[in-house]
Amino acid sequence: MDMIKTEGLTKVYEGVKAVDSLSFTVGKGEVFGFIGPNGAGKTTTIGMMVGLIEPSAGKCLVKDVDVTRNPMEAKRITGYLPDGVGFYSVLTAKQNLKYFSKFYEMKDSDADKRISWLLQYVGLEKVEKPVGSYSRGMKQRLGLAQALLNDPEVIFLDEPTNGLDPQGVIQFRKIIKELAGNGKTIFFSSHILDEVRHVCSTIGIISGGKIIAQGSPDEVRRKMLKDSNVTITVKVPGSMPKLEDSRIVTAQYNGSSAVFTASEDIRGSLSEELFRKGVWVRELTLEEKTLEDIFLETLYGGA
């Protein structure tokens, strides 16, 4: 079942398309990683998906509810952790959550039980000081508790690990995996690939307001590798003969070995040619770029 579906989702500011015709789906229990550099359109997209920004064109459905036409119904089944979440600084975590529970028309007894459980879940049950004295990581954990307050089926997280220390990132990953394991659908944005690939079943890479690749991490890597060369190293017992193949881009020979860059994996062809020449292959290895390498080169022009 598709819990999130966008159809031609577009936002135009002063004639410039900040988000350009996004169409994708996210299934139940799926963790979708929405990745791209700052300014790519991630926050604007999420703003439209949670009903805070009106699309210029297209629509977003959350569990078949049109977010723009039925924002209150969509709010009932969604949770949202914005980048730079804000709270009342003079109130405690419990007091802040109790205030927000009013927006969901929760009974006091139900709200108290839910808040107590959530604070324990995010590790803030023993913190009684005002939120204004919280660290960045503590505020993010409280923000997650607020996003889960109404026990939503779909959760939107905008740069949730931004500014967290390594331990905080690990804690967030653990919670996200637990939520997905319990059937929650999670839409998770970040500008750092490593922060989402550990928990996401599907990723979408956005640049200039457009999704340039989408699928599982392996599928995205293969798709983005189509225009990228591979490196093949060949070693033989004696002298390395010259090898010919139209797909070879460069070749470097050094005694009993050679390193080729090629437009695709040609190990089979190289092995067959060496066999025809009566040369035994001692080593034949392929080196492909990692998803991180491709991501950095495509969006940032390299590391």
Predicted regions and their residues:
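ABC transporter nucleotide-binding domain
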Residues: 173-261
